Amino acid sequence: MAAERYNPRVAEAHWQKVWEENRTFETDNSDSREKYYVLEMFPYPSGRIHMGHVRNYAMGDVVARYKRAKGFNVLHPMGWDAFGMPAENAAMQNKVHPKEWTYQNIATMKRQLKSMGLSLDWSREFATCDVEYYHRQQMLFIDLYEKGLVTRKTSKVNWDPVDNTVLANEQVVDGRGWRSGALVEQRELTQWFFKITDFSEELLAGLDTLDQWPEKVRLMQRNWIGKSEGLQVRLALAAGTAPAGFSEVEVYTTRPDTLFGAAFVAISADHPLAKKLSEGNAALSSFIEECHQQGTSLAALETAEKKGFDTGIKVKHPFDDNWELPVYVANFVLMEYGTGAVFGCPAHDQRDLDFANKYKLKVTPVVLPKGEDAASFSIGETAYTDDGVMINSRFLDGMTPAAAFNEVASRLEKTDLVGRPQAVRKVQFRLRDWGISRQRYWGCPIPMIHCESCGVNPVPRADLPVKLPDDVEFDRPGNPLDRHATWRHVKCPKCGGDARRETDTMDTFVDSSWYYTRFTAPWENEPTDRKAADHWLPVDQYIGGIEHAILHLLYSRFFTRAMKVAGHVGVDEPFKGLFTQGMVVHETYKANGQWVSPADIRIEEIDGKRVATMLDSGAPVEIGSIEKMSKSKKNVVDPDDIIASYGADIARWFVLSDSPPERDVIWTEAGAEGAHRFVQRIWRLVAEAAPALKDVAPKAGTQGEALGVSKAAHKAVKAVGDDIEKLAFNRGVARLYELVNTLSGALQQAADGKADAEMKGALREATEMLVLMTAPMMPHLAEQCLAELGGKVAGKETLVARAPWPVFDPALVVENEIVLPVQINGKKRGDLTIARDADQASIQQAVLELDFVKAALNGGSPKKIIVVPQRIVNVVA
């Protein structure tokens, strides 16, 4: 009898209710089983989830459900990264309070995530804008302040004069504010900083312990930390060229071996010498102001056009008093890095070469590539940056660059310049302290108080939390906290006099730098419960986009170490395993030059070609490239629409099945339809065979077709488990397709009443295995299938969500036959399939029976047959 079609809408709502009523996924910290903590990067509540969220959280859910089935006590929580500028922008544009906007979005997105059937412990949910959360963050801030890990200092920042706020380097686009479009200014502001540089060496060394992280991410962090070993060299200014009070410039270089290729010295626009020279020099002042219009990051400097201003000053070469180098103020040197001054060697640094060509400076190669002739070697448009031997470098000629480095360092360390060594070896880091001050309302208030008499002091712990006031106005740019009539006025905790609150709020990256620790005991009054934190941390598997490779992941690594110093955790690293998934991408479509949504078009096959037209008008639509889903290009697929049309399981299955998880997955309607057909096929096969299998005890077959069924199922259990352990979800999905194909004929026999007792036992076991293996990917379908089979696994009533992972029999997984390549005179001619335990004589006899061997021997006998056990056979004719 044909089964009714599977109805995902009904089944998914039912099983989600069952899981919730049974509190199936709530985690007990006191559970004695081995722990496993799986976490996906928590979302910003922008309004609705997108398909990227579906893929990210589906992957995490597969891991959580699998590990739960393997007997682990799994922590799989969810929360909201809820502070940030978009809420304030919405407040200004839509006249809605950031708090209201944020919590409305959280409610919508929580409903959407619940509709996915994720095995989340919602009892631990929090939003970073919850007072209860940022209260503990303020406690942490004060703890770190008292440990000397928080400081306040002036710093160059990107200032948006329209929005009246500091912008992160990433928010400066072509010199303009990403939202206002205003030309960004560099300003010196007093800011709060976390002293991440105290941990530079630790953060770098710790990368070597993270063997379950992608090498690409570790390399990105290694480069961002940017440890370099170099030489700090004092260069004397040529007499008569420098202003009074200046006699030298100190440069930092990682390539002192190339000093004989030097063509210029470049100093920062903020170097004391540049500032002095700009007094009364309108042209230089104008150039310095232009330098201040670009971003403050190294990345911004590296991408900007290289410009310089010749100061007329000269410095003496450290090895030749008669050799003078011009000094430029340059827009690619930052005062905060090194000494704010560098020497340029155009032949062996691309930036220096571009600069030298622009200003017609001499280019002298001093490193000769292997195989080149020193007399004829020259530099064209590309600098030579690899190894070689030194040339044009006097006493360094013939040395390797490494040897030349040490020779230069040794000589200059021994050379006296005005009573001090002319050079010292120095280790530098690119990493800079983390400025966390933001001139924004919707963030965690910094718990500090400013008093003219007593200075700056922390808010007393008894007065925490410092709550954001609700009665603020968003009628103009800037920080509403600065304008609040009462909130910023407070009494000094030391003298009792009038004082003011800190009105800057914390960078939202602070909120996400410790949330994984809060999930371990979110009900505690202290930021963490040390016992719970030490039990659960580090996170065993963290999943999120590679766009967070540096900032979020590096800040989290710092914060874990800082919290350890403050006594809140006992680990150094927050995330043991890291997986960075690919994006969900989609075709783009245009009609009349405008982007159009996939929901508004029809695509048909006409004469073998895909043709798109508008649904409403029939107008032709241009099918464009496949790109990341974005609202601007309207190639977004709404998960709500997919779940309403196909069900959550199909959305999950598709994003897991179509591509390796680290690569992008292309969303297609055809792919979703294919997943839908597969779901219906599984349901039909199980539901139609269920009456014959419901009361049968599972038992592996021992012979014939029943043995084949059991072998296929047991092999799949081993393989799918291995695939999930490796996060190779697409391979696991492919194996389940194969297993369904293998079982389909036998299941149909059972449905038709044609299966014998042994086959029924084998099918009952194999079908249970199929259901349990499908469960991490398609949990609702799995529950519905098991219910159809009587709700039992191995004879015991259970939910699939609480059932153990099936156990394979090693004897059924081992192949009894092997395929051996057969060579004739060293060239492969075919294969031999034979019993794995066949002896050498049996193999030799079987080889002689092969048609292609008989043909090659032409009635004769071989000189010999060489058998390499389990590997290969070679017939010498």
Swiss-Prot record:
The gene is leuS. A motif ('HIGH' region) lies at residues 43-53. ATP binds at K631. It is an enzyme of class 6 (ligase). It comes from the Bacteria. Its main location: cytoplasm. Keywords: Aminoacyl-tRNA synthetase, ATP-binding, Cytoplasm, Ligase, Nucleotide-binding, Protein biosynthesis. NCBIfam families: leuS_bact. One of its GO terms (molecular function) is leucine-tRNA ligase activity. SUPFAM superfamilies: Anticodon-binding domain of a subclass of class I aminoacyl-tRNA synthetases, Nucleotidylyl transferase, ValRS/IleRS/LeuRS editing domain. It catalyses: tRNA(Leu) + L-leucine + ATP = L-leucyl-tRNA(Leu) + AMP + diphosphate. GO terms for biological process: leucyl-tRNA aminoacylation. InterPro entries: aa-tRNA-synth_I_CS, aa-tRNA-synth_Ia, Leu-tRNA-ligase, Leu_tRNA-synth_edit, M/V/L/I-tRNA-synth_anticd-bd, Methionyl/Leucyl_tRNA_Synth, Rossmann-like_a/b/a_fold, tRNAsynth_Ia_anticodon-bd. Belongs to the class-I aminoacyl-tRNA synthetase family. GO terms for cellular component: cytosol. PANTHER family: LEUCINE--TRNA LIGASE, MITOCHONDRIAL (PTHR43740:SF2), LEUCYL-TRNA SYNTHETASE (PTHR43740). A motif ('KMSKS' region) lies at residues 628-632. Its EC number is 6.1.1.4. This is Leucine--tRNA ligase.
